[in-house]
Amino acid sequence: MNPSSDSRYVDVAYTNGYEFTQGLGYSLPQYPFIAPEELLDKRVGKHPVVIVGGGITGLTLACGLAKLGVPAVLLDEDNTVGVKGASSRGICYTQKSLEIFQRYGIFDRIARKGVEWSVGRTFAGHDEVFSFDLKAQSSFNLSQQPAFINIQQFYIEGYLVERIAELGRDRPGVELRWSSRVTAFEQQGPSALLTIQTPQGSYQIEAQHVIDATGSHTPFHAWLGAELEGKRGDDRWCIADVKFKTTPPTERHTWIEAPFNENRAVWQHLMGDEVWRIDYQMAPNSDPAQVSREDVVRERLQRQFGHDVQCDIVWVGPYAYRSQCVRQMRIGRVFFMGDTAKVVSPFGARGGNTGIADADNLAWKLAAVVRGRAPESLLHTYHDERLEAAQRNVQVTNRTARFLRPTEPAAQLFRQAAL
């Protein structure tokens, strides 16, 4: 495939505009557009729950509701999971997320495809400065799930789509509407009105509860006047998803200062299908088109693994990131979830895993309220419980980002002393 003509740095909170750069690419499923009754009958449909966004957060919530037998509609502007032809995106899933997926019925699929790991090593130059083995910690055996599984995000999203269909066979289900873009929204007292554009025209639906899981570039922030706190960083990275033909790496390694990358940071993770995800920190003024060229990436790989390394590049592309957090997890009928609520740097696997926890927190509460088994006030606890988690994740990842690229003298001195 040819390189994308748009090679700008993009936010790590990936959106449907995240462009394929170059490489063999990933093969993703495609789901057909099925015209809903509202479009065919030219009427306004009414639904208790509408989820906007079919990424890992929205699909996790949809699966949780389907398991509880709560009817809902999920709208996504694409016709596939992941991002068409794009990268592995989130890859590291924690024990807590895996426990949730066990309850939802997809853990076994994840375990078969993904890679379990518990050992990590961190280097500064050629010196190992830190290591851990989570299996050695006393809390490890308290769960049936492993400490971590690495797997490309689109696989989990695909398993969630499968599971939602399975759960809908014998109980009220969640309707997945692909190629359906929300173009307008307004609050109307006890409900909200959404306008949806499709390949066959537009229609409207009413919802008692709207969940915005569209990601960091959501239009709902502007529609609702949501207040956000955050900043954009100038750290630049390049992802390379690589399949080695000879002498692959053996462990998860992190370099705070990698001698083969101009003493900048490097992450090295094994994912499903024997594909390695390698993240290279770039200079702040790097040209994204230059750093993601195949010949440049191969030269970088040779510096790391030796000139005789043989590998296929599955995907490569540049990214930047910012951090931000909403002040309210709920405004009126709308709940913010996942990257819509907070955007964090990728360090510590706190993006997708937090969205999964958001979804699990809200699913049972929505089910209880929709069924009339709990008062509406129960939904207020979503903000109380999940905002603190979002703020904490932004704080922790910002601290990590400052350590990886200190810009102030005090931060530089602290890093030198720590290493």
What do the PLM-derived regions correspond to, one by one?
Residues E128, E162, H209, A213-Y321:
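Conserved FAD-binding catalytic core of PHBH/FMO-like flavoproteins
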Residues M1-V49, G64-L68:
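Extreme N-terminal leader/targeting segments of oxidoreductases
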